[in-house]
């Protein structure tokens, strides 16, 4: 039973470690995952095409208003948006569904492993640590595999496609729009590590609370025999106050991070309005191009 005495594996501290841990489970659904990513790619391609259609429509109307032309571009936009919505639905259905399946498999494997462990393992290591891994930790893994991977891929592909189109139309205006990008990267690096650390502290505190609840329930008769209900209640309240404080600390940091990020991205929008408006008045770009750039900036902000 020597193998039973190994402590619970430490939580992954980096995204790469978390991906390596989850990959054997994710590989079971690689075909579905590939299908979901294909739907994501198609959705992003259609989304990137919409501003181009808007640009063509605005420029064509600038040459002379024709109802048939307006209706044609409007119908094309509606059709592209509808197909994009279908791909987006398929993307979420498949990728989020796979994350639920992976979570289900992990829970089953964890439980199957736990029932084979010896009593010495249970005696040596806190039950709360195991409970935390079976609840909060697995939920976090599911969020990383599902929404985490999906939103990361979606944002990355949208950024590449939008910048590629913008560069082909007006590379100077694109460079101006991307001026705040290094500041955005620095903000993500600065806040990202701190948010991760505070999230880890929350997970650790949840483990402490789970252990305390299990120990209290197991020793309830002893607590009552020695009249320790009030001290135990006070200790449990202290643990919960600490848990709340750690969550508030994370919320405060997030409350600073997201406005800073939005402000930096909004600066890009402002630069496009200023530089693009100037180039429009000087006749260097068309009205459709100006509208297209602003549409792409709106996509990147959201």
Name each model feature, range by range.
Residues 12, 16-23, 27, 131, ...:
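Membrane-interacting alpha-helical segments
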Residues 20-23, 31-52, 56, 73, ...:
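Alpha-helical segments in transporter systems
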Residues 27, 33-87, 94, 167-172, ...:
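Transmembrane helix-loop-helix hairpins at lipid-water interfaces of multipass membrane proteins
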Residues 28, 32-42, 150-202, 272-285:
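Transmembrane helices of ABC transporter permease
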Residues 77-84, 88, 181-189, 254-268, ...:
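Hydrophobic alpha-helical segments in the permease module
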Residues 119-120, 136-145, 149, 153, ...:
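An intracellular "coupling" helix at the cytosolic face of ABC transporter transmembrane type-1 domains
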């Amino acid at each position: 039973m020597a193998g039973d005495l190994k402590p619970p594996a430490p939580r992954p501290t980096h995204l790469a470690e978390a991906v390596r841990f989850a990959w054997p489970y994710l590989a079971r659904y690689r075909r579905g995952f590939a299908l979901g990513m294909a739907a994501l790619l198609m959705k992003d391609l259609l989304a990137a095409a919409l501003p181009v259609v808007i640009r063509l429509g605005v420029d064509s109307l600038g040459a002379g208003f024709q109802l048939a032309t307006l209706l044609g571009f409007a119908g094309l936009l509606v059709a592209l948006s509808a197909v994009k919505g279908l791909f987006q639905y398929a993307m979420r259905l498949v990728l989020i569904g796979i994350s639920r399946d992976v979570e289900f498999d992990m829970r089953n494997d964890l439980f199957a492993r736990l029932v084979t462990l010896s009593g010495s393992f249970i005696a040596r290591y806190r039950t709360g640590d195991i409970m935390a891994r079976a609840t909060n930790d697995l939920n976090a893994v599911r969020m990383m595999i599902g929404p985490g991977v999906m939103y990361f891929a979606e944002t990355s592909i949208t950024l590449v496609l939008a910048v590629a189109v913008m560069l082909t139309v007006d590379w100077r205006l694109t460079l101006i729009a991307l001026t705040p990008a290094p500041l955005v990267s620095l903000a993500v690096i600065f806040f990202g590590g701190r948010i991760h650390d505070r999230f880890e502290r929350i997970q650790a505190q949840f483990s402490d609370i789970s252990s305390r609840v299990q120990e209290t329930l197991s020793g309830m008769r002893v607590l009552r025999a020695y009249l320790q209900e009030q001290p135990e209640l006070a200790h449990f309240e202290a643990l919960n106050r600490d848990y709340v404080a750690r969550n508030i600390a994370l919320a405060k940091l997030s409350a600073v991070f997201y406005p800073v990020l939005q402000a930096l991205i909004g600066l890009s929008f402002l630069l496009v309005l200023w530089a693009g408006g100037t180039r429009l008045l000087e006749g260097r770009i068309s009205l459709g191009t100006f509208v297209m750039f602003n549409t792409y900036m709106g996509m990147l902000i959201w």
